[in-house]
Amino acid sequence: INPNKWGRGITHIWIASHSGILKRNNHKVEFFDSSFYQDWSVNEIKFQTDNKMYKKTNYDDFIKFNRNNIFKDLQNKINKFKPDFIFWSAISSHIHGEGEYVNIQNGYDLLKNLELKNSLLITAGLQATSATQIIFGKMSKIDYLIRGESELVLLEILNNFDREKNIEDKKKSIEKVKGISFMKKNNFFQN
């Protein structure tokens, strides 16, 4: 999931790097981009232009906002794909950087009230690296946080998961991966 709320068309490098390495290693990947949902996104260009921060342009002529309900669309995507994992990174499209600290929350807000079946939630980014216990305290449905660079760690998680047969063995194999944090029986673990 790209949990972007700014409604601007900057492509995140993590999307290509994460999906590329997973696909190259025979994992199925689906993508959900929240950037241009009218009921979710903030039109940051319009906001900044109205407040005289940006010069008026015709940027909006090139943007088409999705008028569907973002939560219904995401739920439909999850129901159709039936993912073992749902991953989002907290890296922002916002040039000034403050979006990185809210994107982890944005991703969680998109998912927390959906029916996720057996999907495990994984996120990464600055907050996952620097405030792991705080994240688990505020976002209890997250299963795993990846600290630091996440492409290879995410790949190892998926590879370990696929090697095992039953869900308990799958989870045990994930818990051995270096660079993750997780909660188990109300105890915090960090590898």
Q: Whereabouts are the PLM-identified features?
A:
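Conserved phosphate-interacting/catalytic interface
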Residues: 11
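Glycine-rich beta-alpha loop elements in corrinoid/cobalamin-binding modules
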Residues: 14, 18-22, 31-40, 61-191
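Aromatic-Pro/Gly-enriched surface loop or interdomain linker
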Residues: 25
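Nucleotide-activated donor-dependent transferases that construct or modify glycoconjugates
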Residues: 1-7, 88-92
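N-terminal start-of-chain detector that recognizes signal peptides
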Residues: 2-3, 57-60, 119
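N-terminal beta-loop-helix "entrance" segment that forms/cooperates
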Residues: 38-54
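N-terminal [4Fe-4S]-dependent radical SAM core
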Residues: 3-7, 45-47, 56, 177, ...
